[in-house]
Amino acid sequence: GRLRAGSRLPSTRILAGNLHVSRSTTQLAYEQLLSEGYIEALPCRGYFVCQIEELVEVKYHGVPEEKEEKQEENENYNYKVDFSPRGIDLDSFPFNAWRKLSKNTLVDDNKDMFAVGNAQGEYSLRQVIRDYLHSARGVHCRPEQILVGAGSEYLLMLLSQLIGRSTGIALENPTYKQAFRVFESLGHPIFPVSMDEWGMKVKELEKTQARIAYVMPSHQYPTGIVIPIKRRQELLKWAKKQEGRYLIEDDYDSEFRYKGRPIPALQGMDDSQKVIYMGTFSRSIAPAIRVGFMVLPEPLLALYREKAGFYASTVSRVDQNILTHFIIEGYYERHLNRMRSVYR
């Protein structure tokens, strides 16, 4: 059924009784809806449906897949506790699984692993990333739209060549320092946009001359803000207003959500090819696993092949093959589940 904006929802206790489920189940469902911005909780009144624009259903049409076609050095300090934002519990790294997959990759003198690979990244890895993003993050794309590179900084530099260095970039204020450094060093005009409790202020964004807005909707760094659906729609509307406008969605740390299900990606709501989606395995596996990925909208994919398709891949085929099997054989999902428990 459909509920009108402002409609009051039954209490978790009453809903649990009506559905014959435990109250904890209905509480979890309401918490998920709250975190995504579909409902709001008013003190002493209850839960109410939020006013949001009509949602656009983005369907995956199963387009036939085409056939193949700088970080500072870390010093070794003996800290008892690492409070740095890049801190990873390396004691929990799956050494046995990684060692096994490394041996399998090099078995029988596999010479192909040392030949020149696909510039966008190995097709098998891009297929695996596509499948994972679709199931875990609600991202809709083809493997051909995915670029694999050695970290988000490299991919942002590559993106800069596609959009042109005169293109203005709007950044959340505060924002991820490395992204700011990359765009500033490349000469892009920077427009800091302040935030409220729901993320980047779109009215302030509209007053800038930016054509690109860099946002972290599912876990903003460093504030931890989750952008609700209404604000996400406003950002998409801003991007749709003019040709050449795009949103960069940095899906930083989205794997580690400890209450409810992970928030779906903004890219999955986009029906106009306006979102450039970015992610990395450095945070979820280990900082030394310098494998990031970027999903380009179709118009930018054509531009990439024209302007930057000649660049060689920055990730070795050996590492890509290990990572591919790490995901396919279920090690990655098990590792994420374990780390959620450790970090909790």
Where are these regions (language model features)?
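Active-site PLP attachment segment
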Residues: C44, G268-L303
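N-terminal basic, amphipathic alpha-helical segments
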Residues: G1-K103, F114, P299-L300, R305, ...
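Hydrophobic residues in beta-strands of the RecA-like P-loop NTPase core, especially within AAA+ ATPase
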Residues: L171, I248-E249
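Conserved core of the PLP fold type I
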Residues: D112-E243, S254-E255, R261-M269, I276, ...
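Short, solvent-exposed loop/turn segments at secondary-structure junctions
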Residues: E54, R86-L90, E153, T175-K177, ...
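Amphipathic, well-packed alpha-helical segments that form the structural scaffold of globular domains
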Residues: R99, K103-V107, R130-H134, Y214, ...
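Residue-level detector of conserved, well-ordered beta-strand and adjacent loop positions
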Residues: C50, S84, S194, Q267, ...
